[in-house]
Amino acid sequence: QRLGHQWAVGHLM
């Protein structure tokens, strides 16, 4: 998994 993906998911959600 990518760190950027985690924060990105929170922003999109």
UniProtKB/Swiss-Prot annotation:
Record GO cellular component, one term: extracellular region
Residues recorded with modification Methionine amide: M13
Keyword Disulfide bond (UniProt): no
Assigned keywords, A-Z: Amidation, Amphibian defense peptide, Pyrrolidone carboxylic acid, Secreted
Record has S-adenosyl-L-methionine as a keyword: no
Any Gene Ontology biological process: neuropeptide signaling pathway
A GO MF term: hormone activity
Modified residues annotated as Pyrrolidone carboxylic acid in this record: Q1
Subcellular location: Secreted
One matching Pfam family: Bombesin
Main location class: secreted
Summary of the tissues where the protein is detected: Expressed by the skin glands.
Cited PROSITE patterns: BOMBESIN
Reported function: Possesses insulin-releasing activity.
Family: Belongs to the bombesin/neuromedin-B/ranatensin family.
Name of the protein in its database record: Bombesin-like peptide 1
